[in-house]
Design a protein with these regions (language model features):
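Glycine-aromatic-enriched surface loops/turns that form tight recognition elements
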Residues: 1-66, 70-237, 242-317
Length: 317
């Protein structure tokens, strides 16, 4: 059965609180209740080794803890809250409003790994020798398959960016947690691309408006498309940041899209409809070269618009 995007569950239904752990029913992941369980920032290699030590000791009765991959940690993010950028009413404690490592390496610069800022939900990459926090997670159902899709990463690297054998590393490339969309994720019909993973429909031409625009102009362009029934439809819109990020493949770069994507003229930066909770003058942007998630100043014409159709989605399942 193909997993789909859905809206968020109510928070009182989403999180199941144990003594020291929290199960996220929306994703099938178990997190430590204490988001600073490991106390201090660590390098990426140190973090991977620390997780191995947790598993050896059977921490909280489990031997399959891991550093979350990028999609797993991203699944906790709320773009409506800050400090921390977690859902309102979440049950976690000691959440550090700074960067947390993921187990996913940057495909273009493999001496860097992805991390997410829990103060504001930015998704960036940094040198693996840097020191950041770690939040252990494990999958609670279907073996290694959470309700999320895999990141796409299938290769492992050391801190210098050299390819290594994945066995025993605990990296995203070894664990490959989640569902894999085997083939034919995208199909085309009259210059429109349907994404079977998300039920969203994108334009094949990822640069249909030819030039970068400011944020308000992106909405005006989508409205104009609807008035003129562009491509036979009148429900085009600017995608939210979670929908844009759903296209990213961690094994790819320039652009960071799945190998079988069918899109043309993909640009480096795209506006989302999601306003920054830190500063309403900024909106979230997807950086398509590597797949980073950052912000752009709304009045500046620096980013492109890639219209989408379909029921607005908030998280993958």
């Amino acid at each position: 059965m193909t997993k789909k995007f859905i809206g968020h569950l109510p928070n009182n239904d989403r999180f199941l609180l144990g003594n020291e752990t929290v199960i996220d029913r929306q994703t099938g992941l178990m997190w430590t209740k204490n988001a600073s369980l490991l106390d201090l920032p660590q390098s990426w290699a140190e973090a991977l080794n620390t997780i191995k030590a947790l598993n050896k000791s059977g921490h909280y009765g489990y031997h399959d803890w891991k550093i979350p991959n990028r999609k797993e940690l991203f699944s906790l993010m709320s773009y409506e809250t800050i400090n921390p950028s977690l859902p309102i009413g979440h049950p976690f404690i000691n959440v550090f409003s700074g960067y947390y490592w993921t187990s996913s390496t940057c495909a273009r610069l493999p001496n860097q790994a992805w991390y997410i800022h829990l103060g504001g939900a930015r998704v960036f990459k940094g040198m693996k020798y840097g020191s950041y926090m770690v939040w252990p997670v494990r999958t609670v159902e279907n073996g290694n398959n959470s309700k999320l899709f895999q990141t796409g990463q299938k290769t492992c690297f050391n801190e210098s960016g050299v390819v290594i054998d994945c066995l025993g590393t605990g990296q995203d490339g070894e664990v490959q947690s989640g569902f894999e969309f085997k083939k034919n994720r995208f199909t085309e019909n009259k210059q429109i691309i349907y994404d079977h993973a998300t039920d969203l429909t994108w334009l094949r031409n990822a640069n249909v408006h030819q030039n970068p625009v400011d944020w308000n102009s992106a909405f005006n362009l989508a409205s104009k498309m609807n008035i003129e029934m562009e491509y036979g439809h009148n429900d085009w819109r600017v995608p939210n940041i979670i929908e844009l990020e759903s296209l990213v493949d961690m094994d790819r770069h320039s652009p960071a899209l799945p190998n079988d994507h069918l899109f043309n003229d993909v640009q480096d930066y795209y506006w989302s409809s999601t306003t920054s909770a830190y500063n309403m003058d900024y909106a979230w942007v997807l950086y398509m070269v590597d797949g980073a998630v950052g912000v752009g100043y709304k009045p500046l014409s620096e980013f492109y618009c890639w219209p989408v159709r379909g029921e607005e989605r908030m998280i993958i399942r």
